[in-house]
Design a protein with these regions (language model features):
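Long, compositionally biased intrinsically disordered terminal regions
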Residues: 128-246
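Short, extreme N-terminal segment that most often corresponds to the first beta-strand
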Residues: 1-39
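Short, intrinsically disordered low-complexity segments
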Residues: 38-93, 107, 117-143
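Short amphipathic beta-strand starts and helix->beta connectors
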Residues: 1-6, 62-68, 105, 220
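Short amphipathic alpha-helical segments embedded in low-complexity Lys/Glu-rich regions
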Residues: 112-116
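Glycine- and acidic-residue-rich phosphate-binding/metal-coordinating active-site segment common to enzymes
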Residues: 96-108
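Short, well-ordered loop/turn elements at secondary-structure boundaries
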Residues: 11-13, 74-77, 101-103
Length: 246
């Protein structure tokens, strides 16, 4: 399956958010939201290729996110979002809230290879390919417009699709016999491309970014790990995604 940089920066990049506004607008919105919650918030510009930008988020922290990263893309109307959560970026919370406050559209996605039981990784991970579209207005489910997901829930594969079907979708795929084939990483890339997003292309991201740091205390028993330590903790092996379907 396809992931950004073959999971070299996972778990940070296992989930990614996108806001349909330029970088400076996204940064102003994130700062305003965080200041309303935590008071003391700082922002500074950062620059470089995506791996260098992502490393500004270290160390990763369990239970709290004091560092968030906004990254310009080569589609000027889209800004990418990442954070320092140990378990991976919480794109849904940030994108959902900022779409409301900024009055824009947004996307969150997740791509996790299903390596459990394959021997490709020590512990193995439950796989998922997920995409959620957000809007500026409230819907029956927060401000989610559309959500499509194939994920292993620990006992079986599940396919779910909720909200308003979009013109760029391939609904005939949703009845395929194998559940994990109903929404694949290739399909996710095609859907994102229809919106002007190239999720798996390193060159799509940067070089400009904004690092936002909030005065959030680390959770009492939350782990604090460097990226390589987090990968060892979760048993993530970059490149394993290339050997599994999805």
């Amino acid at each position: 399956m396809r992931t950004l940089l073959s999971d070299r920066l996972a778990p940070i990049t296992s989930s990614i958010g996108y806001l349909n506004v330029p970088l400076d607008t996204a940064a102003a919105g994130l700062l305003a939201w965080r200041r309303g919650l935590y008071g003391r918030v700082h922002a500074r510009p950062v620059e470089g290729p995506l791996p260098r930008l992502i490393h500004h988020l270290e160390p990763l922290t369990g239970g709290s996110r004091s560092r968030e990263l906004l990254v310009a893309t080569r589609s000027p109307e889209w800004t990418a979002f990442f954070d320092c959560l140990l378990t991976g970026t919480d794109a849904d919370t940030a994108v959902g809230q900022l779409c409301l406050s900024l009055g824009c559209k947004g996307v969150s996605l997740a791509t996790v290879p299903h390596t459990l039981g394959t021997g490709l990784e020590p512990q193995g991970r439950y796989g998922a390919v997920q995409m959620t579209l957000y809007g500026p207005l409230r819907t029956d489910w927060l401000n989610r417009v559309r959500s499509i997901s194939v994920a292993h829930d620990g006992s079986r594969w599940r396919f779910d699709a909720d909200g308003t079907e979009q013109d760029f979708e391939t609904p005939s795929a949703y009845t395929r016999r194998k559940i994990r084939d109903r929404f694949t990483s290739d399909m996710l890339a095609e859907y994102c491309a229809a919106l002007g997003i190239e999720p798996f292309e390193e060159a799509f991201y940067g070089p400009a970014g904004v690092l936002v740091t909030s005065d959030v205390p680390t959770a009492p028993e939350g782990k604090v790990l460097r990226l390589t330590e987090a990968q060892a903790w979760f048993g993530i092996r970059p490149g394993a995604n290339e050997q599994v379907p999805g």
